[in-house]
């Protein structure tokens, strides 16, 4: 609530949440509020949120860890999805908005796998099942 109010008054607010993925980050923010306030929070969030960067460390083939990221930039389509509570559409919108600077965790992990940075096993382990079936 304080962060949203600060953003509404022109302050740049950074926050960290223990979530993986933009959709779960949005859900976590909204779910903190009582059900009767959630629609208003969606509207406010859609007006002030600039973007979400999600990251996770994934074991790489050299025995260390490599950073996998997801970037969601709040353009008009993303703002509408948040406002309307259709967070299930965020993933698809990010995956088809590469030219706007967005990409999903799945796309990042697939690129890491194809470049030989992570193993097929770790690709499947860190990618939701729907995307992991695309490994070739």
Functional labels for PLM-detected ranges:
Residues 1-136:
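Short, flexible helix-loop junctions that flank or precede catalytic/ligand sites
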